[in-house]
Amino acid sequence: MKKNLKYYLKNKLTNKDLTFVPSSFDVVGDILIFSEFPRKLSKKEKVIGETILKTYPHIKTILKKTKKYSGKFRTAKLKVVAGEKRKEAVCRENGVLIKLDVEKVYFSPRMSSERKRILQLVKPNESVLVMFSGSGIYPLVIAKNSECKEVYGIEMNPIAHKYALENVKKNKLENKIKLFLGDVRKIMPKLNKKFDRIAMPLPKGGENFLDLSLRYIKNKGIVHFYDFLNENEFYKAEEKIKRVCNQYKKKCK
């Protein structure tokens, strides 16, 4: 958005109310999502939503998060503030189209640059595994934009998996992507396969699956592990990795 949202609301809200207007939001396709919407503006949310719709015609639905990410699928509750009463979106990222329900499937558009970084690291003929593959965004961008041999994806959320299957077909990548529904601890042993690269894009609790990734990574393979920490706490992630590597007698760097 070219100008700060407050600029377009200055004639519709009091100066005091303007100070509470959220400055950050996510856009997934034609849906705009406020992660944090102040209670003090609850009576003004319709005005704010309608203003966004009039100012930015490409936005069709405004949502606000009413419950933070929770549960085993890490999903959030969302409320329609203005516009079309739907939560399903189609967006384009790194050359692929992806369809999903933003309330029923975990998806972070803010990780787009990270997904691009990963795909640029993939070498020709690599076998890649994406644990917790969601609606398929990681397998899709890797398969579409790299010379990998294949990408496997495992997801426990049946709704996300259903979207992933549809997205693979939509992007005509059936020949490079193989998707599995279920618990990674049950699926991975059945694959009877090791990988050159394993991505673990789990927003919370990834350390509980590090042991699994180390068992199925090839020698000199690469595991992409994620942990959300403050800058002065990065050492904690390193300690988690080293502890598991030592446990399984793996060299890591």
Model regions: which residues?
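SAM-dependent transferase fold signal centered on methyltransferase-like domains
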Residues: 1-253
